Amino acid sequence: LSLIEFMTVEPTDDPELFIGRSEPYGQFGIYGGHYLGQALAAALQTVPEPMLAQSFHGYFLAGGVPGKDLQYRVTSLRDAKRGATRTITAFQGDTQVFFMMAAFKQPEAGDQHQKVGPDVAQARAADNLHAARQLPFMFPIELHDRVEIEWASKTFFEGSPGDPHPLRLWMRVRGGELLDERERQIVMAFLADGPLALNSIIHHGVPMDTHRGASIDQAAWFHR
């Protein structure tokens, strides 16, 4: 299955309940982005088009059992002409494993601003340096050959004091060029708990061979 096919959740006779697959992610249990992507996919099924996700905040409550189906219950907190708010709770059996609150709105033009991005090696150049930057492990999102990652950072295990962008990389989902805007948001939610989250610790030079990180919560805003 492609990533977007795997993130798809199936409706049930209950309009607020959706069923999603799960699978092992190595020693990490169920990867946090798996919850994020499927929860957003469930909520989007309850929101009329052309609304898109504006933001979400998710809380990881339990590791979950890989290979066991997930049930996502969506609750409507607000439905307005130009926006909507949903909560999404994921269960395995009677165990609550994940919770999300998400906001949605109609696409519209508005004021825009953007910080100047850092200089990053183009994907092809990063690919040429792949062997020199080979990591001694794979990230969960790489395990099922749905996501390609190329590192553009000079180093991975050492922080760069004063550098606000210590981790630079390219990520590509196989078949991503065929996705619509909602599907791209689901994919971005899936990727959000991946390597990019490590920017919070790499800046401090925390050695990954002696420290273990775990996601407690995750917030994201979708900008146009």
Residue ranges and their predicted role:
Residues 1-224:
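Terminal targeting signals and extreme-terminal segments of soluble enzymes
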